[in-house]
UniProtKB/Swiss-Prot annotation:
The gene coding this protein: purT
Domain of life where this protein originates: Bacteria
Domain ATP-grasp span(s) in chain numbering: 117-306
Lineage: Bacteria, Pseudomonadati, Pseudomonadota, Gammaproteobacteria, Alteromonadales
Subunit description: Homodimer.
Keyword Methyltransferase in annotation: no
Catalyzed reactions: N(1)-(5-phospho-beta-D-ribosyl)glycinamide + formate + ATP = N(2)-formyl-N(1)-(5-phospho-beta-D-ribosyl)glycinamide + ADP + phosphate + H(+)
Protein name: Formate-dependent phosphoribosylglycinamide formyltransferase
Any one Gene Ontology cellular component term annotated for this protein: cytosol
A GO molecular-function annotation: phosphoribosylglycinamide formyltransferase 2 activity
Key words, A-Z: ATP-binding, Ligase, Magnesium, Metal-binding, Nucleotide-binding, Purine biosynthesis
Similarity-based family: Belongs to the PurK/PurT family.
Amino acid sequence: MIGTPYTQGATRAMLLGSGELGKEVAIELQRLGVEVIAVDRYPNAPAMQVAHRSHVINMLDGEALKALIASEKPHLVIPEIEAIATQTLVELEAEGLKVVPTARATRLTMDREGIRRLAAETLALPTSPYVFCDSLTELQAALKVTGIPCVVKPVMSSSGKGQSVIRSPGDVQKAWDYAQSGGRAGEGRIIVEGFIDFDYEITLLTISAVDGIHFCAPIGHRQEDGDYRESWQPQAMSSLALDRAQHIAREVVQNLGGFGLFGVELFIKGDEVYFSEVSPRPHDTGMVTLISQDLSEFALHVRAILGLPVGTIVQRGPSASAVILVEGESSNIGYSGLAEALAQPNTQLRLFAKPEIHGRRRLGVALARGTSIDEALQTALASAGCIKVHFN
């Protein structure tokens, strides 16, 4: 049973992380009558603007997190980012708190080491060669295992922060320094990954729900500086590669446990499929599903975590998303060009309403459908290009 917000019988969900993905989750929760409490480290975050109420705390502070949960008494805690005191969630789950999908999944996926060791060592799934390092000396030694080129990432980061490619021995110091500056929890451990000469990479949105495991059509995407710039659905791939991708995703998701949507990232080389990463929550490349499916990844996540059946997922045909990425400094951001952007055929816009920008930040996304992936992608790019951002 779901209660009514602001009443004694309300069903309360607490979002830990209130960015653009959390905002869409909040909206879908509210569609089904759930009372939403949005939490983040800064005020006026996107999901806070549509939640019933909000709080600003350091979510890496276990005591602060525990105190807030004790005060609000949520029925569901929904992590939307990695930078959370996950050990606190593990302890609270043992006391009866419902963490989505599970506290274990949140802990394992908060850093790249936990999930990579699960996939490669526990589940024996194919991955790139990798080494974890705690020092520059260890990084230099790791290159003998991974070879050059290789990718260096902090074990805990997102949106490409701290991620770089070593293409020659002269890049090693710079890669180490960048990884140390880009981690979510500050300086620390890194992963060095051997370079897979893949044909393309996909996100396979995988839903674990009361009526079983479900897959969305594969999503292709383009990354730049470790961050997604465009995505499209469906990504064409062989039936054998798709079967292998679904097998890997199913293995990982079932091991992590719980109900919810998981963004499983995979590299594809011919018919070979390699596991890369997984997020136990909606994925940024999956924003294309806001226009490409009858149920977006956010709607699917909410259905699953509320214990509701997913049923059949209808994919509407070639669709694409293009990010509105801006660089600057402002705490008073404005937008123009919306009319021109929406004059593009079969388009939609999402402006995230982020309260400020310091450096480079994703402020919105253009969505489009077309008769082909190329047409949808070009339309989405044209629509995104119409948006002008003003720092007032």
